[in-house]
Amino acid sequence: MATPGAASAELVIGWCIFGLLLLAILAFCWIYVRKYQSRRESEVVSTITAIFSLAIALITSALLPVDIFLVSYMKNQNGTFKDWANANVSRQIEDTVLYGYYTLYSVILFCVFFWIPFVYFYYEEKDDDDTSKCTQIKTALKYTLGFVVICALLLLVGAFVPLNVPNNKNSTEWEKVKFLFEELGSSHGLAALSFSISSLTLIGMLAAITYTAYGMSALPLNLIKGTRSAAYERLENTEDIEEVEQHIQTIKSKSKDGRPLPARDKRALKQFEERLRTLKKRERHLEFIENSWWTKFCGALRPLKIIWGIFFILVALLFVISLFLSNLDKALHSAGIDSGFIIFGANLSNPLNMLLPLLQTVFPLDYILITIIIMYFIFTSMAGIRNIGIWFFWIRLYKIRRGRTRPQALLFLCMILLLIVLHTSYMIYSLAPQYVMYGSQNYLIETNITSDNHKGNSTLSVPKRCDADAPEDQCTVTRTYLFLHKFWFFSAAYYFGNWAFLGVFLIGLIVSCCKGKKSVIEGVDEDSDISDDEPSVYSV
């Protein structure tokens, strides 16, 4: 018989893996932010803020497999609870995860609504050399106050918004919906926190639709297509230089006799001279790229990039198929929009929903897969942001360039990634709803068996995978799932957002297929902050 210490042992295993992953996350965030920040405009506070905010989001997402691991390890594969998993211990373990979410989500609210806006506006004011540091802080606090007010409003609305599902539904499914809404508790503080985080997750959904969906198609196709040849681009650039020089010479020849140039020719001459400066700058960068050992090294890795591109597009198709089947299942079998399209049981199986519970039985294989999925979303989101840029409606605010991203753009970048990572938890639920809800838990059901040797029927207890049909005391729902479904209207918005995600992915796939190869120095024409003596890092 297992001793009470087994509970502590199981808990320690899950949290030890979480601790190791935490260290890996911090290392990844430091490398990632340092890779993109500008070398000439690097600021310590903005760098630390970007690393910390991105790390908090990733750590929160890393709590998902810990949550699933702990509820799964309360039960044996035969559907019975383990000896140590009595009601008090189960509640204690669940509360441990819940307190983890409380802490991390509170820190996220602090970062999004106070610290990141404050640092951003501080550096916006710092660009003005005439202002003192005290004035910069006061101005930054004044603008940040608006974000604090928004956060306070979200907390107030979340604390008192009605959670009751419609009472005109009498079916057993609606009783289950009501149970799920009430399971996490009726605390106003918890409801306020959940509402605020769900609001941020909704914004993250919009960012995922804009950037991640496009990046999932752009990243693999860019790897497969590669970039244009530096030598060929340099040849074309040389021809353009000669052509522009001829135009300049033609215009200047009109004033050889001392006559002043007409205003039209002056404007044309100015444009050609500006164009010539840009072309010569491109010439220097192309020459550097062509002779670089890094270019030759990347050329040798070209077959590997093609293989990675094919792998990424296959993974993208796997996600899209799983998401489509999951959403179709909700459309056909859910309890409706008033329940947030909550689904009871998997009527249409999808690949990830079948794979994750199998991997979960061999810890930490599912942890590894979840980490890969989250990292995949991060890299595809980054690819989308690099291709599209950061926009406010039709105005481009910032470009994201490796080694050339300004402090303000870096904060924007990490804010967007933070919101996308928040939405990742719901994306994983959409891809594998049964896994996120119950993990690998089984419960016992009574089955009647007719025996030829004995008159009458006998009953046999057989294990069955946990689903919404299971008795409430036989299966433990993850805290993550309950956080995601505290408010039904957010779940409904996520459902429609998934369809939009699929649509944007298909559009991005078509656009990426139609676009030609990227320039080996793409962006050099637009980057006014590139100095002539700094031709370094480009994507090759």
UniProtKB/Swiss-Prot annotation:
One of its GO terms (cellular component) is lysosomal membrane. A motif (WTKF motif) lies at residues 294-297. It is found in: Lysosome membrane; Cell membrane; Cytoplasmic vesicle, Clathrin-coated vesicle. It is a multi-pass membrane protein. The modification Phosphothreonine is found at T238. The chain crosses the membrane at residues 11-31, 51-71, 101-121, 145-165, 189-209, 306-326, 365-385, 409-429, 487-507. Its main location: membrane. Keywords: Cell membrane, Cobalamin, Cobalt, Cytoplasmic vesicle, Developmental protein, Endocytosis, Gastrulation, Glycoprotein, Lysosome, Membrane, Phosphoprotein, Transmembrane, Transmembrane helix, Transport. Residues 1-10, 72-100, 166-188, 327-364, 430-486 are extracellular. It comes from the Eukaryota. N-glycosylated. InterPro entries: LMBD1_LysCbl_Transport (IPR050854), LMBR1-like_membr_prot (IPR006876). Pfam families: LMBR1. Glycans are attached at N78, N88, N170, N347, N448, N457. GO terms for biological process: clathrin-dependent endocytosis; gastrulation; insulin receptor internalization; protein localization to lysosome. Belongs to the LIMR family. LMBRD1 subfamily. Lysosomal membrane chaperone required to export cobalamin (vitamin B12) from lysosome to the cytosol, allowing its conversion to cofactors. Targets ABCD4 transporter from the endoplasmic reticulum to the lysosomal membrane. Then forms a complex with lysosomal transporter ABCD4 and cytoplasmic MMACHC to transport cobalamin across the lysosomal membrane. Acts as an adapter protein which plays an important role in mediating and regulating the internalization of the insulin receptor (INSR). Involved in clathrin-mediated endocytosis of INSR via its interaction with adapter protein complex 2. This is Lysosomal cobalamin transport escort protein LMBD1.
